[in-house]
Curated annotation (Swiss-Prot):
Protein source organism: Geotalea uraniireducens (strain Rf4) (Geobacter uraniireducens)
Keywords, sorted A to Z: Ribonucleoprotein, Ribosomal protein, RNA-binding, rRNA-binding
GO CC list: cytosolic small ribosomal subunit
Record PANTHER family: 30S/40S RIBOSOMAL PROTEIN S3 (PTHR11760), SMALL RIBOSOMAL SUBUNIT PROTEIN US3C (PTHR11760:SF19)
GO biological process, one term: translation
Protein name as catalogued: Small ribosomal subunit protein uS3
Amino acid sequence: MGQKVNPIGFRLGVIKTWDSKWYAEKDYAKLLHEDLKLRSFLKKRLYHSGVSKIEIERAAGKAKINIFTARPGLIIGKKGSEVETLKKELAKLTDKEVYLNIQEVRKPELDAQLVAENIALQLERRVAFRRAMKKSVTSSLKFGAKGIRITCSGRLGGAEMSRTEWYREGRVPLHTLRADIDYGFAEAKTTYGIIGVKVLLFKGEVLSGK
């Protein structure tokens, strides 16, 4: 079970929490679609800003969006000019007042989503997949990860037949619910087709009572 299911969804309500924090009754479907629209828009718009996670909170017809990023300077811009433009674009998209909160990810090497996106970027630049995987594993362990597993699937190295290769170092206990496991997925669009990159990063165990 732990091998197949999304590690974050599996731990929701145990040690992980939801990325959308709001409650609705009759407008639930509409707001859910709005969340999806906001997330895909922000991911495309801030593609080069290293966005790790987008949290959405709603209350009284207003939306607060927390953006976790490795490069906050790119999103904020000179004297906050970029943020103001982004706010206007989001308000137009949702017809609501939008508040933005930009939070810096201090150690991108310990964020599974950012690690996956970094590997995907290297694959698009024609770096050998094994080298990209090993480099990311080494740097994550150096920054304090207890274990990491990276999987690449697709036409690796331009091979005729697609295959899956993975590389792991340290412990990655997928069945242990108290294990703090971060999960990230990214796609590399290469000339041979799409290569999927999955990253499972074990940060340690969350002890009960915390």
